[in-house]
């Protein structure tokens, strides 16, 4: 009997990118990546990261792909912080159309409540920082939808398993030393 080895994935054609510009979207997932090692200006840090994902109204046109006809899903990674300079805070305030009150900041904001919330996304094609030959559709702005827009409903179930690449990122999380110490007490 033959034992055949194949290259099972690297020959797949990349999906076409969604159109750049402004598009209607709905939040379809919030993934907690846990504590991740990051590097900024040569300094290594450990920060709690999350990913917010949206389905956009544009569908994938790639007949050879298993995703043909499905909505594009875009995402953005954030540090889990509502600090004054935090990108998460800036984007949430833009999406909500209003700043957080001091009481909201003190009480915190439950990101899981974003599932199913509509918005407009600014989408820009940008080269990868490491490999400029790779181009991605990045979320550059999040705005509240205009009044009267027909709301989108996520096709992705709230409790659906994250994609493989997200699971791999979660697996890279640094163990929370403080939580382990509290469990040991």
What are these regions (language model features)?
Residues 1-185:
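Short beta-rich binding modules
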């Amino acid at each position: 009997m033959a034992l055949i080895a194949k290259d099972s994935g690297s020959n797949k054609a990349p999906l076409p990118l969604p159109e750049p510009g402004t598009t209607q979207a709905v939040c379809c997932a919030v993934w907690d990546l846990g504590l991740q090692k990051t590097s900024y200006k040569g300094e290594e840090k450990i920060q709690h990261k999350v990913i917010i994902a949206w389905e956009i109204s544009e569908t994938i046109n790639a007949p050879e792909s298993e995703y043909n006809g499905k909505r594009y899903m875009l995402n953005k990674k954030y540090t889990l912080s509502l600090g004054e300079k935090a990108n998460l805070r800036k984007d949430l305030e833009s999406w909500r159309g209003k700043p957080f009150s001091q009481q909201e900041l003190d009480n915190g904001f439950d990101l899981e409540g974003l599932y199913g919330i509509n918005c407009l996304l600014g989408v820009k094609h940008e080269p990868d920082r490491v490999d400029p030959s790779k181009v991605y559709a990045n979320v550059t702005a999040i705005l509240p939808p205009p009044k009267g827009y027909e709301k989108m409903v996520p096709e992705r179930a709230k409790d659906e398993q994250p994609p493989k690449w997200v699971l791999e990122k979660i697996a890279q999380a640094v163990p929370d030393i403080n939580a382990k110490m509290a469990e040991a007490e």
